[in-house]
């Protein structure tokens, strides 16, 4: 699902809320989450999961196209850890398949 599909689905379910308001709220939630991660904060949404930053050490990688060695700098990457309720919900659906 992409952001525009999220707007559409919420708008379909909450017909009494103008689409512009829904778009504004979703964009602001995502922006505040991004700003919080930029500051190094952890974000926890109970029942859904948590977002944090993971440190990646500098290393020697490989260009898959050419095979040549490439130096990769150290960096922080966003990480999502699903909460127990989300994991259980997904596992219950796919257990049936």
UniProtKB/Swiss-Prot annotation:
One of its GO terms (molecular function) is DNA binding. It comes from Buchnera aphidicola subsp. Cinara cedri (strain Cc). PROSITE patterns: HISTONE_LIKE. GO terms for cellular component: chromosome; cytosol. This protein is one of the two subunits of integration host factor, a specific DNA-binding protein that functions in genetic recombination as well as in transcriptional and translational control. Belongs to the bacterial histone-like protein family. PANTHER family: DNA-BINDING PROTEIN HU, INTEGRATION HOST FACTOR SUBUNIT BETA. Keywords: DNA recombination, DNA-binding, Transcription, Transcription regulation, Translation regulation. The gene is ihfB. SUPFAM superfamilies: IHF-like DNA-binding proteins. This is Integration host factor subunit beta.
């Amino acid at each position: 699902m992409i952001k525009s599909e999220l707007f559409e689905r919420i708008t379909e379910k909450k017909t009494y809320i103008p689409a512009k308001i829904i778009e504004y709220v979703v964009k602001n939630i995502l922006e505040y989450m991004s700003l919080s991660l930029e500051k190094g904060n952890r974000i926890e949404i109970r029942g859904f999961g948590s977002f944090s930053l993971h440190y990646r050490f500098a290393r020697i990688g490989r260009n898959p196209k050419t095979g040549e060695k490439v130096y990769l700098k150290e960096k922080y990457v966003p990480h999502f850890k699903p909460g127990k309720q989300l994991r259980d919900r997904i596992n219950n659906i796919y257990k049936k398949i």
